[in-house]
A protein has these predicted regions:
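Serine-hydrolase catalytic machinery in alpha/beta-hydrolase-like enzymes
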Residues: 7-96
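Alpha/beta-hydrolase fold nucleophile elbow
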Residues: 92-106
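A conserved short beta-strand
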Residues: 119-131
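Short beta-strand/loop motif that positions the catalytic acidic residue
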Residues: 142-143, 148-150
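Catalytic histidine neighborhood in serine/cysteine hydrolases
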Residues: 165-181
C-alpha cells in the first residue's frame, strides 16, 4: 500500500509518502532535510527488505529557500516530533516497531527527537551529518541503539561521530564505508538485528 501524508505548519505544508508492504517488519522514517533523487531508490530497497518506509519533508518549500534552514536543529527536531505524533495517531503505522534512518543535516535533530521519544523510537542509523551538533544532553539521554555510517573520505563526519561516541551511553557502532559500498547493507542489517531483538 502507498499513501501520501501532510502536516500543516505556519510556513506551509510538509508532504510525505508511506510505502507499506504487507506484512511489514517495522517502520523506518527516512529523515532528510530536503528530498533528493536517491530517496525513492532508498525507500524501494528498504521495502524490499520488508520495512514500511515513511519519507517526510522536514522543511516546507518556503523554508527551504533560507540558506541556514538545514542547520536549524531546534526547528528540525520539532518537525520530527510532529511526525512522531502523526505516527502515534495513524492506524497503519502506530503499532509497527519504529526506526529512523537519518541522512546528512537531519542527523543532529534525529538524535534530539529520539532522545525525547525513547519509548517510541527503537533503533537509529545515520549516514553523514554532524551528529555531535545534537548536543551533550541529547547524546547522553539517547537510549535507542545507533549505527553511525560514514563515507571513507568524509573526515568531518567521522570526527563528529568520534566526538559524539565519547558521550553516548546507548549501544552504538560506527561503520566506515569502503569505496563503492552500499550503505543500506549495513543499515538493513542493523535494523533487522534490533527490531527482532
Amino acid at each position: 500500500m502507498n499513501r501520501t501524508l501532510a502536516i500543516h505548519t505556519p510556513h506551509g505544508q510538509l508532504y510525505g509518502h508511506l510505502d507499506l508492504p504487507e506484512p511489514a517488519l517495522g517502520l523506518i522514517i527516512l529523515a532528510r532535510t530536503h528530498h533528493a533523487p536517491a530517496d525513492a531508490a532508498i525507500a524501494e530497497k528498504l521495502t524490499e527488505h520488508g520495512y514500511a518506509v515513511l519519507t517526510m519533508e522536514l522543511l516546507s518549500s518556503q523554508e527551504a529557500h533560507f540558506v541556514d534552514a538545514t542547520q536549524n536543529v531546534p526547528k528540525l527536531t520539532q518537525r520530527l516530533l510532529e511526525i512522531l505524533d502523526l505516527i502515534r495517531r495513524d492506524g497503519d503505522m502506530q503499532n509497527l516497531p519504529l526506526g529512523i534512518f537519518s541522512i546528512g543535516d537531519a542527523t543532529p535533530a534525529v538524535i534530539r527527537a529520539a532522545a525525547q521519544r525513547d519509548t517510541q523510537v527503537k533503533v537509529l542509523a545515520s549516514h553523514g551529518g554532524l551528529i555531535d551538533h545534537a548536543g551533550l544532553q541529547a547524546l547522553k539521554a539517547l537510549t535507542a541503539p545507533l549505527l553511525m555510517v560514514v563515507d571513507s573520505e568524509d573526515g568531518v563526519a567521522d570526527a563528529a561521530n568520534r566526538r559524539a561516541a565519547s558521550y553516548l551511553l546507548c549501544a552504538h557502532e560506527t561503520h566506515l564505508l569502503s569505496i563503492g559500498e552500499d550503505p543500506l547493507l549495513a543499515v538493513t542489517t542493523w535494523f533487522s538485528r534490533h527490531f527482532s531483538g
